[in-house]
Amino acid sequence: MNQLTNFMNPVAKPETFDMIKIGIASPERIRSWSFGEIKKPETINYRTFKPERDGLFCARIFGPIKDYECLCGKYKRMKYKGIVCEKCGVEVTVTKVRRERMGHIELAAPVAHIWFLKSLPSRIGLLLDMQLKQLERVLYFEAYIVLEPGLTPLEKFQLLTEDELLDAQDEYGEDAFSAGIGAEAIRTLLENLDLEQERTDLMEELATTKSELKPKKIIKRLKVVESFIESGNRPEWMILEVVPVIPPELRPLVPLDGGRFATSDLNDLYRRVINRNNRLKRLMELRAPDIIVRNEKRMLQEAVDALFDNGRRGRTITGANKRPLKSLSDMLKGKQGRFRQNLLGKRVDYSGRSVIVTGPELKLHQCGLPKKMALELFKPFIYARLDAKGLSMTLKQAKKWVEKERKEVWDILDEVIREHPVLLNRAPTLHRLGIQAFEPVLIEGKAIQLHPLVCAAFNADFDGDQMAVHVPLSLEAQLEARVLMMSTNNILSPANGKPIIVPSQDMVLGLYYLSLEREGEPGEGMLLADMAEVHQALHIGAVTLHSKIISRVPQTDEKGNEYLKRFETTPGRMLIGECLPKSHTVPFDVVNRLLTKKEIGDVIDQVYRHTGQKETVLFADAIMALGFRHAFKAGISFGKDDMIIPASKEQLVDETRSLVKDFEQQYQDGLITQQEKYNKAIDAWSQCGDKVANAMMDEIRATPKLPDGRLAPINSIYMMAHSGARGSQAQMKQLAGMRGLMAKPSGEIIETPIISNFKEGLTVLEYFNSTHGARKGLADTALKTANSGYLTRRLVDVSQDCVVIEEDCGTTRGMEMRAIIQGGSTIASLGERILGRTTLEDVVDKDGNVIAPVGTLLDEATTQRIEEAEVQSVKIRSPLVCEATLGVCGKCYGRDLARGTPVNIGEAVGVIAAQSIGEPGTQLTMRTFHIGGAAQVNEQSNVEAISDGTIEYRDMATIVDQRGRRLALSRSGEIAIIDSEGRERASHKLPYGAQIMHKDGEKVKKGDRIAEWDPFTMPLITEKQGVVKYQDLIDGKTLTEQVDEATGIAQRVVIEYRAAGRSKKEDLQPRITLLDDASGEAARYLLAVGTMISVEDGQTVQAGDVLARVSREASKTRDITGGLPRVAELFEARIPKDNSVIAKISGRIEFVKDYKAKRKIAIVPEEGDPIEYLIPKSKVLEVQEGDMVKRGDALISGSPNPHDILDVMGVEALAEYLVAEIQEVYRLQGVKINDKHIEVIVRQMLQKVEITDGGDTTLLPGEQLDYLEMMEYNAKLPKNGKPAEGRPVLLGITKASLQTRSFVSAASFQETTRVLTEASVQGKVDSLQGLKENVIVGRLIPAGTGAAMNRVRVTASSKDAALRAAMRVANQEHLIAPRTAAEEHAAELAQGPEAAIGDDPLGKVQGEDFTTDDVMVEERPEGASEE
């Protein structure tokens, strides 16, 4: 019987294998799978509905149609099991075998497998060293190929047309050489390949080749040849002689009503193949003319191509309704393919969905489940319980009772549901908090009730959202749901470690209102003894919630004893104080202030850190109830009159109008350019808008005193916005201020602002202007969702196999963290960045005392101490430099953000990182900003001191000009501020030509301006004095007078000059030369295109004068990619559009020579060889001849190319750059993400190395492979062998996911056919280490609880082996112990099939009846269950 469908062991359980290998099937292998040859294209008999014999659904080949019944009906029932009916030839067995048994088609002529032919690079082409075009001509019978030239002058592999072939045969004789056509010819060539010989030839060629491009091609071929040798695949197997036919149940034929049939497309494709094959056989028997046979063979080839991959070559074969037929490849590919539809995303039973409504009276761990829904979901449990209680005799009766909904059923439902958590999920599930467990509470109605505090995690609102309910069935699942997924366990967000259970909207408003303190309220200044008195006073109206009172509040000391302490507070704040947990770590002070949404979040954070999870949950529930109650009691509402339009608006608008008129006039008079006018106008209007907004806020914020001495009630709109409940200052500005400037869809700003606000109403023109940008916004939102989802998918795919696998990898590398400071304000403090990380070195304060020893996990208290000691930088461990193989270690990762504890082994940190970065993706913008207008305002143009200290110049050459200003002349210089203890507080890079306010060593105060510069132009400053001489500056060729058409003012500008014709003399280099007194050349300055010259020819200049200006506008008007596209660009490691050029070494700049459109410059180091760069002339150089540059400095401005950073500066610098750039995009949107998530992803992008030196291994220079694989190769070397070396390569996330070591995971991501083709040629083995592969083969993932199970499995199998050895010694007399693996296998086979089941140590453990190891020994037959 066939090995695939051994009835005792039908399909290998996913637990029993550890690896999956993919290869190319040989014809023998295909025949051994098959249960018979399919000879006819018929499917079933349409009259009797019985399958045709030898057809595509033949019962004799594939198995019976009904269980244990042969086709003709001679044998029925179980007792004939295994008998083959002599009449119809059908074996009596279960129908299920029709899902497993395969057939085959013997082809009359060999056919090439389209995957190996057309999947680029073509494997057949690489092996034979032929082009795909030529191969196709041979395979599709258009040309002959010379197989053996014999003694003729023809060459092997030469293509001949039919006429050429006949001529050659006439000339040399028919037997002098042999030529072939079609797949047969290719097969002969592949059979005759000597792979070993080919390998040695290629190696020699590689060693001797001189050209640049050759090695790449040779390496490609060498790889294919080697993979064939190593995998044991034969090249001729890429040509098929036998086509396998998949089991009929997998390509079903279903009768529809009305006598029609619905069938799988595969049946059509198979029928085509069989028809053409049979016709070809007949033609060959009839000895038909060659041309007819050849045509039939070509058609057969095309039919098989269509079966395997329809549409890959030639016309797509379509069905009756012009729809392309789905081939085998299409079954796997894409979102609807096998991988993504059925293996990675399955539908589950025991689930339901319904609309959600709010459930404010629920506890945090509860959800309201409609009774009807619960009854349906928990049916099996109810049947079991009815049965156990003896209420129903049979299952049928139990069903009836449940359907009739008798009252006993409801009681039992209550019992069943108690303590049985359910999972709630809201699509789209963007992060792991999108599925959480709750305890169901039965409710009437048909809607699910959801606790208001978890809405933020689900991103749910109650405007008609739906949610799905799932029931965890097994005990383990219930346990995990309760211990790990319960909503009470998910208080902190895994993205940033801040609480995600934070009150919002009404609750915030209520708490804000409670914590308001107001002057002149009744009962102000009362002294109240304690909480009871406060309640009483409130009840009788002696005080209001906002009266200032003095009262005693119960506090807890460190020993846990209560005592009373006096506070100046308000009754409202005391009500909030009542909810606080009783602990000395959260004193009443935390709520004795005005609470906005942010502050409430901080309080919850503090409560969680100091008192733990249980107290936090109780506190959250309490303040939620309090918030709702008081939002309701406050009765806050607003009307039109609450939007107060400031009185000063008119005047401000008029002032700005006249200002803009002035700009218009200046433009007409030619004092400013069009662009400058636009910028100034937009500046003026945006400032006006801000002034109006500020005036409005002042008026709305104000609470004037009423005649009776009380304050006027606070403005409701202001309360809502200020508390963070709803609305923002920007929205208030539009309601009652001035709508402001609008953008066009292109992102440019329209020059005329909208002066009205919504209260006044817009004019028609204003309304039209505002719709322009609004529509763009709506269209963007739709695109954004899809883009963001795709980014998340790629991120998950690249990082899914990154799991914490050990405690400590023991690395000595790390990253240096310091505070991020931009434009004088701290964006991220040092404490924020190192919180929850592990130190790499001792952290010491200025006196040398250790604050945190090496290996400390920094918690809040320690980081606070570090910040107080004013430590400037801390070295920490990072997942980037973690040396753990196949994952990261706990120390490098640090704290698990969602729990606030050190990370557990088995935590899937990769997926968490991907979700944390992808989830806020929908909040990012899609725009690429065109700079222009208001965006220019934020261009930085000065540096201020962030603290007191002393100025220190570093590599900073300066010059003092005639006006006594000190100008920076160095391009890589820095200016640092050193504090009194000698520590560096800040260092700033200054642009060339910046004016520096202080001398080296001068003292500065905090907030002093250190330097400033013009952000829009870059000057060219002379360092010597002399006389200006123009060179190659010829009017009309390289120099032009540009006159602004509107103003008539002329400026001399250098233009690009292309020499006409081929005259070499005309190669002009526009430059200014300075002549000193002796008329010698003192200095020369090359001028880039677009430079405006500020001096005359022959003018005398002093040191420090400006010779010319380059407009930085030119280098700055490029689009800034913002938002989501920018994040994607960084993660894909794309080379940016205007990429800068980085100096690879430090040295002096020299200009070598000019070419037509490029210029060659060199960096000459102090020792070693110079490095040359070719730079387009259109680019503005940041350096001049003779400048000193440092390694990593930019030669041309622009966005740096991440690959360059990696090559020049190393892994840490690259990571720092990527983290900073990605964080900046998110920070602009106000999204907080912890750095370590980005580091995890960058780690996955840096897994590969490019071999620089193969050493004594078989690796070739230029090959790319995993760092681990390179180490494996090196480990195999003999003792004194020279190891291979490589340099890290940065791969984009898509590329990195496609190049994972697991082919199953890569195939399920993208380009399925290509991945599988490559894997099968190499005979790849997937060791199933990542998460995705395990999901696909259907076992527990090796993360979380699955990691523990994995460990158990390993120990169990080793124990098994030990037991077996012991048994073998005991049974020595029964069984002579086999010594080799082969003998052992033979002994196993001799025992019959029963022994070979139960390979899996956990397979024995089923349900309740656990058996211990020693009991198992007794039951097992000798030597059974070999692993």
UniProtKB/Swiss-Prot annotation:
This protein's UniProt keywords: DNA-directed RNA polymerase, Magnesium, Metal-binding, Nucleotidyltransferase, Transcription, Transferase, Zinc
Pfam families, A to Z: RNA_pol_Rpb1_1, RNA_pol_Rpb1_2, RNA_pol_Rpb1_3, RNA_pol_Rpb1_4, RNA_pol_Rpb1_5
Cysteines paired by S-S bonds: none
Residues that bind Zn(2+) 1: C70, C72, C85, C88
DNA repair found in the keyword field: no
Positions with biased composition (Basic and acidic residues): 1417-1427
Binding site for Mg(2+): D461, D463, D465
Cofactor: Mg(2+); Zn(2+)
Transmembrane recorded as keyword: no
Reactions mediated catalytically: RNA(n) + a ribonucleoside 5'-triphosphate = RNA(n+1) + diphosphate
GO biological process: DNA-templated transcription
Molecular function via GO: DNA binding; DNA-directed RNA polymerase activity; magnesium ion binding; zinc ion binding
Residues that hold Zn(2+) 2 according to the record: C809, C882, C889, C892
PANTHER family: DNA-DIRECTED RNA POLYMERASE, DNA-DIRECTED RNA POLYMERASE SUBUNIT BETA
Function field: DNA-dependent RNA polymerase catalyzes the transcription of DNA into RNA using the four ribonucleoside triphosphates as substrates.
Name this polypeptide is given: DNA-directed RNA polymerase subunit beta'
